[in-house]
C-alpha cells in the first residue's frame, strides 16, 4: 500500500513540475488517502497482534 502511495506521490510531483495542477492535486490526494489507510491498518494489526492468541 505504501508503494502505491509513493507512486502517486511521484506522479503528483512530476505533474506539478510540468504544470498539470489538476492531475497533481488528484494524485496527491490519492497518495495521502493511501498513506492514511496504511497507517490505520498498521496500528490496527499492531494492537491485534499484541493481544496474543487465546488459550485453547
Curated annotation (Swiss-Prot):
Mind listing the UniProt keywords for this protein, alphabetically?
Cell membrane, Membrane, Transmembrane, Transmembrane helix
Disulfide pairs here are none
Membrane-spanning residues? 6-26, 29-49
Query: Key word Transmembrane present in the record?
Result: yes
List the subcellular locations: Cell membrane
- UniProt membrane topology term: Multi-pass membrane protein
Q: Name one GO cellular component term.
A: plasma membrane
Family statement: Belongs to the UPF0391 family.
Q: HAMAP family given for it?
A: UPF0391 (MF_01361)
What protein name applies here?
UPF0391 membrane protein Noc_0484
Amino acid at each position: 500500500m505504501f508503494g502505491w502511495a509513493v507512486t502517486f506521490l511521484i506522479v503528483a510531483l512530476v505533474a506539478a513540475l510540468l504544470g498539470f495542477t489538476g492531475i497533481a492535486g488528484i494524485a496527491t490526494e490519492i497518495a495521502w488517502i493511501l498513506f492514511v489507510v496504511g497507517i490505520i491498518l498498521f496500528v490496527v494489526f499492531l494492537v491485534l497482534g499484541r493481544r496474543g492468541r487465546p488459550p485453547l
